[in-house]
Amino acid sequence: MQGFAGKVAVVTGAGSGIGQALAVELARSGASLAISDVNTEGLADTEERLKAIGAPVKADRLDVTERGAFELYADAVKEHFGKVNQIYNNAGIAFAGDIEVTEFKDIEKVMDVDFWGVVNGTKVFLPHLIESGDGHVINVSSIFGLFAVPGQAAYNAAKFAVRGFTEALRQEMELAGHPVKVTTVHPGGIKTNIVRNMTAVDSVDKDQLTKTFDKKLANTTPEKAARIILEGVRKNKARVLVGPDATALDLIVRLTGSGYQRLFSTVMSRMVPEAH
């Protein structure tokens, strides 16, 4: 198992939630941190927490959809720390709405952040990770990268894409003999503001959906999620399921095959009747 002391870790979406918790846990484990977010207020909060721990930190505002800016950022991080060992492509947004009433621009936005943001981060940092001789790509998908549910087609598409991209990358690194490990992360319901901050079509009762998520679905704290993720990274796991719900739902999908679709549609309609 690998440790984190002396490693340089990049964390996107580090201004809140899982990203912030990952940065803090990595700092406590002896890593140096390059953190970024579009939320500068949250980013500053994370930076202060890391400095209080005593970790070397570089904090920058970064929109993961801006490829050119990401390229410059990767070079700046390498120049600042001298190396890069790990990248946690964590930045993401949520969206709710049936395809029939969802506009193209909303689907594109979700794909830009949740999929292309991951691709951008992976591509621009991969040469530095290979050069380090001890690299690791950690891409955050979702339980919605394991199965689909109504009202989440755009998010499902992005998270399924992250899963496929990352699993292919892991095999490519192994076949090429590159010193880069690759892990896909599938969080279940985490106690963050992702649903509260999401966008949605007009027919979605966002307040009710948020209440349902907070009360019935958000079972794991970001801090617990971070510990689970980092334990998976230490063990070089190909896939990390975060939370008891993620483990249970993954098992259901494996056991039922495509039959899960009817089951989940029924459950979703009863749990969130106002969402459609």
PLM feature segments, named:
Residues T40-E41, D60-L72, F104:
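The beta1-alpha1 cofactor-binding region of Rossmann-like NAD(H)/NADP(H)-dependent oxidoreductases
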Residues T122, A158:
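Active-site helix of classical SDR
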Residues E174-P244:
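SDR active-site lid
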Residues D98-I99, E103-K109:
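Substrate-binding pocket helix/loop in short-chain dehydrogenase/reductase
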Residues S142:
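Residue(s) in the substrate-gating loop at a strand-loop-helix junction
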Residues V8, G15-G17:
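Conserved glycine-rich cofactor-binding loop
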Residues I53-P56, A76-I87, F95:
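A glycine-rich helix->loop->beta "capping" turn
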